[in-house]
């Protein structure tokens, strides 16, 4: 698990985290998260390896779809885990990956514009 691509966008001041979609039913399993780059980390606790640890926590941007309990926000955007590059003025190159019939991995870059609405993170530019 984890973040496959993390990119800082100077235009918005935020960090974009593209991940492979999760499968755990207790989580919203978004593919894309935006970390609010304008907020300082806050001290808080997490549980890791059955131990409670005090850490600095980052804040997700107040945008995107809300999880059922309202604690997590993100987008269902299947692209970007294999490439996410901020360009300027809200534009990004985002990888569309695929596997060929003979098993080779490929990608095609597409130019997107950041919109950050509740339903759509990006639109093709």
Please give the residue ranges for each predicted region:
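Conserved catalytic or regulatory cores that recognize and/or transform ribose-phosphate-containing ligands
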Residues: 85, 94-95
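Residue-level signature of beta-propeller blades and closely related beta-rich strand-turn architectures
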Residues: 20-23, 90, 97-100
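Beta-propeller domains
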Residues: 77-78, 100
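Short coil/turn segments that connect the beta-strands within blades of beta-propeller domains
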Residues: 11-13, 88-91
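Loop/turn-rich, solvent-exposed surfaces of beta-rich toroidal or solenoidal domains
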Residues: 1-74, 80-83
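Sequence/structural signature of beta-propeller modules
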Residues: 97-125
């Amino acid at each position: 698990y984890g973040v496959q691509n993390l990119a800082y966008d100077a235009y918005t001041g935020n960090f974009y985290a593209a991940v492979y979609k999760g499968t755990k039913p207790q989580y919203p399993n978004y593919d894309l998260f935006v970390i609010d780059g304008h907020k300082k980390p806050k001290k808080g606790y997490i549980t890791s390896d059955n131990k409670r640890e005090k850490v600095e926590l980052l804040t997700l941007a107040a945008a995107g779809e809300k999880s059922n309990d309202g604690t997590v926000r993100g987008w269902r955007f299947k692209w970007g885990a294999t490439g996410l590059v901020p360009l300027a003025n809200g534009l990004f190159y985002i990888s569309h990956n695929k596997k060929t019939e003979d098993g080779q991995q490929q990608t095609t870059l597409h130019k997107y514009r950041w919109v950050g609405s509740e339903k759509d993170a990006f639109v093709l530019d």
